[in-house]
Every structure is written in structure tokens, then in C-alpha cells.
Amino acid sequence: MNSSSIQRKILVTSALPYANGPIHLGHVLEGIQTDIWVRFQKAIGNECYFFCADDTHGTPVMLAARKEKITPEQLIERVGQEHYTDLTSFGINYDNYDSTHSKANQEISKDIYLKLKEKGHISKRSIEQAYCEKDRMFLPDRFIKGTCPNCNSKNQYGDNCEVCGATYNPKDLIDSHCTLCGTPPVVKNSDHIFFKLGNFHKKTEQSNVDFDLQSWIETSEAVSESEGVKKKLKEWFDAGLQDWDISRDGPYFGFEIPSEKNKYFYVWLDAPVGYMASSKNFFEKNFPNEPNKFDSFWKDKNSEIVHFIGKDILYFHTLFWPAMLEGSGYRSPSKIHVHGFIGVNGEKMSKSRGTFIKAKTFAKFLDAEHLRFYLAAKLGPGMDDIDLSFDDFVNKVNADLVGNLINSVSRVSTTILDTLDRTLGTVSEEGLALLEEILTQPVKTGTRDDSIQNIIKTAYEQRNYAKVMREITRLGDRVNRYVNDNAPWKLIKENPEKAREIVTAVLNASRFLAIYLYPVVPKISEQIYKLLNLKGSPEFKDLDKSRILEKTKINPYEMITKRVDEKAIKVMLEENKQSEHPKKEEIPKSSNKEEGIEISIEELSKVELRVGEIVEAKPVEGADKLVNVKVDLGELGIKNVFAGIKIAYQPENLKGLKVVVVANLKPRKMKFGISEAMLLASGEGESLSLFVPHKDAKPGDRLK
């Protein structure tokens, strides 16, 4: 972490949500990750701004508006409001949330293009494209379907086959058709405009600029944190950087390219420029007397520009975007932080499986601060995917947030404090020792000791939020032990002033923990501040013994947050599923199987159900439905199981999952090996769901 006391100037962005769909938990993950970092920077006194916008251009937006019989402008205005409402409901606090369909964005996009053209970074050439004569438009690859030329799978997109993975030219599709009207497309030539990306790679013959992308990536710290990112970038450099098609033919919703007829900027040119436009609109409105405010970030490398993105848009942000900026007189980003995807209950987000969770539905039934807390506990600095396991979510929030960090506040803020006229006393030597543990306790970090405060600050800076949460939770445990050891509910009867000392120490400790927690759960931290009769938002400069509260009045206690209600999760998941798949009337299936056969308790007792933990999972070659798992059953050892669950679970997501196992099943010889047990599951097809034990079950535990 930069330990300098000089205030840093930081401009932060998160990726732009596309205006053709609802906000889902993937968007929320990135928004929360970015917001935590921004709140931390502001809380330690840096000048930091957070910008985003709706990504509004492209064929899908144009066609969606046409389908609704409204203009694209009407569509993006409505969707933009919906997106902003959904994202901010999770406490994501933008300094400005804009739209890429703005005058500022058009002006900056035009300026960048003309400067690139002037410096020889733009070329034009004719290309072949699919054209629908009925709709009178050139078709993007995703608006063409047909039979794969490689494996003959039907209903595949124009650029790649989802069955065999082959990539191809749209004209190679068999029996191709326009997805809008079903008409077979024809091939037409069209002049397209290209950005000569190879000019910014010195290993290519045409390179003629000072800025070299590969050198920038290898020598700067912009994208150096993840081995996965560096490996992927090396692959792209080794393959050679190709010219990038930055134009689209009309009809197209976007900005027209200067001096070109019926040509529009491809959405990926003006989308990242939206970061700049959002900041420009904000600075002009809020700093009217500082006309150079925009340039002080986008042209001055003494400031910092930090992008948070998902790993699926790495190519655009690490290659095209910095080259466009440097080639047009602006500066390249300081940092590009890349995160992974979010899964739900061990699966990828999927509409068909009901795991594609919309932000609006989640926030309707569950506390958004709880999700912030949970995601922070899972997020590290790399681009690993994370999983939202709702069982783990319940346990983590109820135990670590409510049962630990909030519990220490509520235990001393109700009846005990009422008896003490809701007034703090002074902090005893023992209480001061507790506060020093929270503020300055030395902790071993590698070969040296560092204070707990610096460790937490450094972890925030490095986006290692999981480490932040571990340290804060550990401190919360310490405060609760202090409460237990001193039992103020007993002291209040024998020695009220001693009880007042205990309460004073605990509430000061809670105040300091609220400061540490503020970037993660701002509302909860502000509620603790309100309880303590403190004005404003928590700031890290108050993490000091000189800020201890003594002999002050404390406000009446109000509920800070509730435990997670598991019923609310079930209702949320069901409503989310129904919104994606409206319930259809089902025709009852006839069945020859006997149902409702009764068995005796003696027969049931023969079945040995135990908790197992999957320690290994892999697909079975030649078996589409099977997954080969090894299950740890505690004292019974590890058993080999072939389970027909592949339609619902990807093997790579199963490791570490606790399941219910029929442990005493007679081993069964199968074509692929011996299966020694059975995993319990319910449902069919993609709705199949493994039974997962509740709470802290251990491998080998027997079900009763």
C-alpha cells in the first residue's frame, strides 16, 4: 500500500451494464467490489471518484426498441433508470451514473477517432458480410443461425457452434437464416473502418509509435496481479495483434462516423469512452471553476485511473482501450483489476436452472448489506470465480455479522445501558488494552510485525477483502470474549459504575470496528454511529485513542440488522424462477410405478445415511450423464461414486461440497468402474438438486 500521507487523486470505473437486459448478481458483484474500494479510498482521505454508465448502443438495443414499438432513446432512458435503481439498492454509490448516448460521449469518441486517423492508425477495406434483404440490414453474427458446418448440429449461431465449439465464418453455415425473419441471408461487400492495433506492438512490422502495449503490460503494474491475466495476454501477443473493425453499417443505433456515409461506431469503441464522458459531465457540473479537472485525470499520469472489469472483457480493456487512449493524446490506465464470475449454489448462473438471479428480486426479499458482507468475505485480489452458496450465506451472515459483530453492540446497548441512564463512563486500563488491540495490535506479516490497522488498510488497498473480513471477525470475537469475561449484566446489580466502564469499552470497540467495516456495510456502520450519537460517516482518521468516547449520551437502541430468514431465500428463488419461466399448465404423467408403499422402521434403519464431502470430481469419458466423484465419509474413509448428475452440475464446481450419501450400499460394478455409495438428490433434468446438509455438518456424521 502507498504509505505516503500525500492525498491521491483516483478516478475509478466499473464496467458498463448493457441496456438490453436486467441487472443480475454478476453486475452486482462488480459494483460491490468497486464500491468497497472507492469507499475505502474516500474514508482514508483520498480524492476519489466513481463513474459508470449504461452501455446503450448496438443492434440488440435497436431491435428491442423496435419490438416494443418505441424509439431506442425511449428504451435506454427507461432501462437506464431501472439499472441505476437496482444497482444503488445494493449501496453502490456512484459519483455519476451516465449513458453512453450523450453529447459528451459523442464528442470525445469523435475526437479520439479523428486523432487516431490523423496519426495513421485508421484504415479502410472491403469485407464480405451477411445481409438480410427482407429486413434491409447487415446481420451481426448472433443474428444468423443455421447448421454447423463441422458437426452438423442445427440452430447454431453465425460465429461459433455451442455443441462442438468450432468457429467459422457466417457464410459457411449450412441452411443459414436471419433470426429476425427466417429469410436466408445473402453475401454483400461493404467498406469497413479498422483500428490498426498492430501499430502499438513493436514486434509487428507496422509499429511506429512510442507506446508499446506489451512493454506497458510487462513493465507497469497496470495488469500485473494475476498470473491468469498475464498468461492470456501473452497468448494474444504471441498470436499477433489484428486490426479491429470499429464500424458498423446502418441501420444501427449509435454515433455516425465523421465523413462516412451510413457508417456507425461499433459499440465497443464508444462504450469505454463512456467512462470519460461520465466523468466529464460530472466535473463540468460540480467543478465549474476548474475547467482542467477532466484533463487532470485523463492526461496527467500523476493521477490514477482504475478500471474494475470482469475477465470476459479483458481483451478490450487491456489492448484496444489503452492503445486508443495513448494514440489520441490521452493517458493509459493505472490499474485494470480483473475479477471472476459468480455462481449460485455450485452452478453457473442459468435461467433454465433458476440460478440466474436478478438484482431486483434479491433486494426485494433479502438485505442488500448482507450480500455485501458475504461477497466481501469471499473476494480476493485475483480473478477466481466465486460461489454464492445460500447455506453458506445464511451461516456466514448470521454467525459472523449478526451473531458476532452486531451482537457485541446489542448486548450492552439495551437494558444495561437503560439502567445506566444511557450514559457512558470512562475507559478502564483493561478496557484501554482492548481498544489498543483493535487499533494498534502488532501482527506477524511475513518476516516483520505490522499493526492490525495497517494490515486491514493494506488488504483493502489490494482488494483482499476476504482477509479484511477475517481480521475484523477475529477482532469481533475478542470484543465478545471481553463481554463474556466481564458479564456486565451481573455487574449492573453489584457495581453499576464498573458495568458502565465495561459498556464504555465495548461501545468504543464497536465504534472502531464500524469504521473498519464501513466500506463493506456502510448502512450498518452508520447505524452504529447513529446509536453512539456521532454525526457524519465513519472515517479511518478516527481510528485513534484520542477519539475514545467518554461520558457521552447514547441514543435509544434500534434494530441494526436482522438474521437471514431462510424462508425468504426460498421465496426469492421461487419468484426469480417464475419471472424467468412463467408457470405453464402441466399435464399429469401416467406412471406404472407403485407410489406410497409403506416400509417398517426396521427396514428404514438398514439405510445408513451419512454426510460426505466431495474431494474429487471429474467427468466420465463416454458417459454424458455421469460424474465420477470421491466422497470423504470421515471414519468410513473415501468412497468412489458414479452419479448421474452431470446435466445439473459441472464437475469442477463440486469439490468441497457437502452432500448426503447412502454409505452402506452394496458396491456395484459398472462399465466405468465400481460405485461404492449413492448421492441423494431430488428432481429431474436440469432441476436435479443434491441434498446438502445444513449448518456445520462434518464428513461421516450420521443423519438421524
Curated annotation (Swiss-Prot):
<keyword id="KW-0436">Ligase</keyword>
<feature type="short sequence motif" description="'KMSKS' region">
    <location>
        <begin position="348"/>
        <end position="352"/>
    </location>
</feature>
<dbReference type="InterPro" id="IPR001412">
    <property type="entry name" value="aa-tRNA-synth_I_CS"/>
</dbReference>
<dbReference type="InterPro" id="IPR004495">
    <property type="entry name" value="Met-tRNA-synth_bsu_C"/>
</dbReference>
<dbReference type="GO" id="GO:0006431">
    <property type="term" value="P:methionyl-tRNA aminoacylation"/>
</dbReference>
<feature type="binding site">
    <location>
        <position position="151"/>
    </location>
    <ligand>
        <name>Zn(2+)</name>
    </ligand>
</feature>
<dbReference type="GO" id="GO:0046872">
    <property type="term" value="F:metal ion binding"/>
</dbReference>
<comment type="function">
    <text>Is required not only for elongation of protein synthesis but also for the initiation of all mRNA translation through initiator tRNA(fMet) aminoacylation.</text>
</comment>
<dbReference type="GO" id="GO:0000049">
    <property type="term" value="F:tRNA binding"/>
</dbReference>
<dbReference type="InterPro" id="IPR041872">
    <property type="entry name" value="Anticodon_Met"/>
</dbReference>
<keyword id="KW-0694">RNA-binding</keyword>
<feature type="binding site">
    <location>
        <position position="148"/>
    </location>
    <ligand>
        <name>Zn(2+)</name>
    </ligand>
</feature>
<dbReference type="Pfam" id="PF19303">
    <property type="entry name" value="Anticodon_3"/>
</dbReference>
<dbReference type="InterPro" id="IPR012340">
    <property type="entry name" value="NA-bd_OB-fold"/>
</dbReference>
<dbReference type="InterPro" id="IPR002547">
    <property type="entry name" value="tRNA-bd_dom"/>
</dbReference>
<dbReference type="InterPro" id="IPR029038">
    <property type="entry name" value="MetRS_Zn"/>
</dbReference>
<comment type="similarity">
    <text>Belongs to the class-I aminoacyl-tRNA synthetase family. MetG type 1 subfamily.</text>
</comment>
<dbReference type="Pfam" id="PF01588">
    <property type="entry name" value="tRNA_bind"/>
</dbReference>
<feature type="binding site">
    <location>
        <position position="351"/>
    </location>
    <ligand>
        <name>ATP</name>
    </ligand>
</feature>
<feature type="domain" description="tRNA-binding">
    <location>
        <begin position="603"/>
        <end position="704"/>
    </location>
</feature>
<dbReference type="InterPro" id="IPR033911">
    <property type="entry name" value="MetRS_core"/>
</dbReference>
<dbReference type="InterPro" id="IPR015413">
    <property type="entry name" value="Methionyl/Leucyl_tRNA_Synth"/>
</dbReference>
<keyword id="KW-0820">tRNA-binding</keyword>
<dbReference type="Pfam" id="PF09334">
    <property type="entry name" value="tRNA-synt_1g"/>
</dbReference>
<dbReference type="InterPro" id="IPR014758">
    <property type="entry name" value="Met-tRNA_synth"/>
</dbReference>
<keyword id="KW-0648">Protein biosynthesis</keyword>
<comment type="subunit">
    <text>Homodimer.</text>
</comment>
<feature type="binding site">
    <location>
        <position position="164"/>
    </location>
    <ligand>
        <name>Zn(2+)</name>
    </ligand>
</feature>
<keyword id="KW-0547">Nucleotide-binding</keyword>
<dbReference type="InterPro" id="IPR023458">
    <property type="entry name" value="Met-tRNA_ligase_1"/>
</dbReference>
<keyword id="KW-0479">Metal-binding</keyword>
<keyword id="KW-0067">ATP-binding</keyword>
<feature type="binding site">
    <location>
        <position position="161"/>
    </location>
    <ligand>
        <name>Zn(2+)</name>
    </ligand>
</feature>
<keyword id="KW-0963">Cytoplasm</keyword>
<dbReference type="InterPro" id="IPR009080">
    <property type="entry name" value="tRNAsynth_Ia_anticodon-bd"/>
</dbReference>
<dbReference type="GO" id="GO:0005829">
    <property type="term" value="C:cytosol"/>
</dbReference>
<feature type="short sequence motif" description="'HIGH' region">
    <location>
        <begin position="17"/>
        <end position="27"/>
    </location>
</feature>
<dbReference type="InterPro" id="IPR014729">
    <property type="entry name" value="Rossmann-like_a/b/a_fold"/>
</dbReference>
<dbReference type="GO" id="GO:0005524">
    <property type="term" value="F:ATP binding"/>
</dbReference>
<dbReference type="GO" id="GO:0004825">
    <property type="term" value="F:methionine-tRNA ligase activity"/>
</dbReference>
<keyword id="KW-0030">Aminoacyl-tRNA synthetase</keyword>
<protein>
    <recommendedName>
        <fullName>Methionine--tRNA ligase</fullName>
        <ecNumber>6.1.1.10</ecNumber>
    </recommendedName>
</protein>
